[in-house]
């Protein structure tokens, strides 16, 4: 049985409409986990048939970091001035995705940025490679 068959068979017994997956995406001020910040984080939960159930999204204030790559994601400094910080939404975000199988496109990037924000928030440098057990959609596409 292939990777996709295992994945689908693992979750299809669930009731349609019950969220079991969460697809996560972040937008950042850049690519360096030590200096750059997440300025948008979003998740869509889906049922076992990959039908969207609900979504969660917020812009984030990057604590004084200037957004220099607005041309990529369209998020400007003005848009995040009054947005909450990562630490202010962390509980809501983790509650929303709790118990979900997580997906992300280029998951290692999103994961390292979430880890970096969490480390800044807690004051602990975990330096772990994983935040949650993400399935990377880039790797998933290679299985097809």
Locate predicted features.
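Conserved non-catalytic scaffold segment of RNase H-like nuclease domains
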Residues: 2-132
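Histidine/lysine/aspartate-rich catalytic loop segments that bind and position anionic ligands
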Residues: 128-144
């Amino acid at each position: 049985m292939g990777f996709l068959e295992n994945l689908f068979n693992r979750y299809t017994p669930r009731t349609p409409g019950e969220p079991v997956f969460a697809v996560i995406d972040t937008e950042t001020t850049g690519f360096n986990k030590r200096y750059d910040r997440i300025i948008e984080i979003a998740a869509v939960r889906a049922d076992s048939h990959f039908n969207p159930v609900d979504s969660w999204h917020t812009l984030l204030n990057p604590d004084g970091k200037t957004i220099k790559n607005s041309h990529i994601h369209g998020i400007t400094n003005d848009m995040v001035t009054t947005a909450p910080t990562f630490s202010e939404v962390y509980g809501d975000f983790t509650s929303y995705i709790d118990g979900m199988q997580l997906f992300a496109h280029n998951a290692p990037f999103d994961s390292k940025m979430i880890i970096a924000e969490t480390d800044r928030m807690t004051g602990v440098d975990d330096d772990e490679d994983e935040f949650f057990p993400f399935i990377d959609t880039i790797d998933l596409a290679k299985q097809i």
